[in-house]
Each structure stands twice: as C-alpha cells, then as structure tokens.
Amino acid sequence: FQIFNAGAAIAALRALGKDQAACEAAVTSAFWPARMQRLRFGPLVEAAPEVELWLDGGHNPAGGAAVADTLARMPARETHLICGMLNTKDVRGYMHPLAPHVTRLHAVSIPGEKNTLPAEATCEAATAVGIKAVTAASVAAALTQIVADCPTARVLICGSLYLAGGVLRENG
C-alpha cells in the first residue's frame, strides 16, 4: 500500500513541475514512524541488546500482508511478535498472512485503551490461524520472556498504532 502512496506523491510532484531528482529525493527520504521501524535505542533495546527489535502499527489484513511480505524478504531468524490489537479490528485477518513467518506470538493488552482486545482473545485468535501464542502482562514482560527463550530473536511489536505510539513514547 505504501507503493501506491508513493506513486500518488510522485504524480503530485510532477503535476507541480518538480523534476525526477526531486521525486527521487522525496521517496527516498520519506519516513513513517511505526511502519517496520527498527528500534535501535531506548530501554527496550537495552533490555535485549542482541535482539533485532522492530515496530509496526499495521492493524488490518492489508497491514498483516505487508508485514508478512517484509518478513519473508528478511534473512532467516527466529521471529516473535509482541501483539496488541483493538476489539474493532479483524484480528484473524491481520494474523493469517503472518503465520508462516512467526515462531511465537506474545499477546498483550494495550495499556490505557478502552477498546483493547484482551490479551487472552488475541492469543486465541493467533492460535486459530496456526500461530503458537502466549499472553504477557506488558510489552516489557513479553520481551523478557522472549530473551529468556531466544536472546538473538527478531522481535516485532505490532497490531495497533495505539500500541506502537505507546512503545515510542515509553522507549524514547
């Protein structure tokens, strides 16, 4: 979906008379926080220095498919999700494309969000689409569980822009 957005932006730049160099600069310098964003500093990274830590706010089937495509292109590595979602989303639709790429999902509730899907329900949805899943009290607790099992895992915190925003605020 980001390719379509980039295409629209390039079309707008061309309509404004911008040259190819301006279009290339615009696309290559674009940054959207919490869209497969690598976390490289902060308390979460310090708690798991050997973990490859990522953050993505996708929360619908198209977002799940985009993340799955990205994971499929990455070098092989044990991959864990820390996932919190809203009760208004198609949780199974989001998770289904991720199933082949995930070692385990650690389900969390989204702190302070009244429409959070309880971690237990997120866990059940993951299990229903073939993902091994457990619950955790928080993102930090899930990360601690993951590091204890596989200190060099790839970890993707995902499932909600609300969860992603909270992680960015708390992680610095």
What are these regions (language model features)?
Residues 1-104:
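Nucleotide phosphate-binding/pyrophosphate-handling subdomain across enzymes
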Residues 14-15, 49-55, 95-154:
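C-terminal helical cap/extension that packs against the catalytic core
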Residues 163-165:
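Short, active-site-adjacent cap segments at secondary-structure transitions
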